[in-house]
């Protein structure tokens, strides 16, 4: 005789059989499908976690490398600036040395020129004195007309010019 369940006429054997099959299916699903599926899900979760950890480590390493590169770039800039400053100082020192050498050479040339001018002046004065003496002798000889010998006149004029030169 069929048993009524919730107002439907379903035989009890069918209900028991369906329940047994359902439970058997659950056990089989748990053993053969749910377990492996959960294992795969667990493995996938671990894999994703490992990938995230690896990505975080890679990100941290990349940040560290970027910071190191920035430091190296900063250090390179500092070294380049120091090199430029040293080159500028060396150029200024070299310029000062060249200017000093040029001034020294100019002073030497100037002193040499002054000495040359002095020597030329002395030679010109000596030549002029000779000419003046010679002219004086000629004039005196015409004026005196041989009262004194020519040698005595030259000596007399030279002595006179010498005295005049020393008096100045």
Swiss-Prot record:
Domain of life of the native organism: Bacteria
Keywords: ATP synthesis, Cell membrane, CF(0), Hydrogen ion transport, Ion transport, Membrane, Transmembrane, Transmembrane helix, Transport
Name of the protein described by the UniProt record: ATP synthase subunit b
Single annotated GO MF: proton-transporting ATP synthase activity, rotational mechanism
SUPFAM superfamilies: F1F0 ATP synthase subunit B, membrane domain (SSF81573)
HAMAP family with a match to the protein in the record: ATP_synth_b_bprime
Summary of the function given for this chain in its UniProt record: F(1)F(0) ATP synthase produces ATP from ADP in the presence of a proton or sodium gradient. F-type ATPases consist of two structural domains, F(1) containing the extramembraneous catalytic core and F(0) containing the membrane proton channel, linked together by a central stalk and a peripheral stalk. During catalysis, ATP synthesis in the catalytic domain of F(1) is coupled via a rotary mechanism of the central stalk subunits to proton translocation.
Main localization category: membrane
Gene (UniProt): atpF
Record-linked NCBIfam families: ATP_synt_b
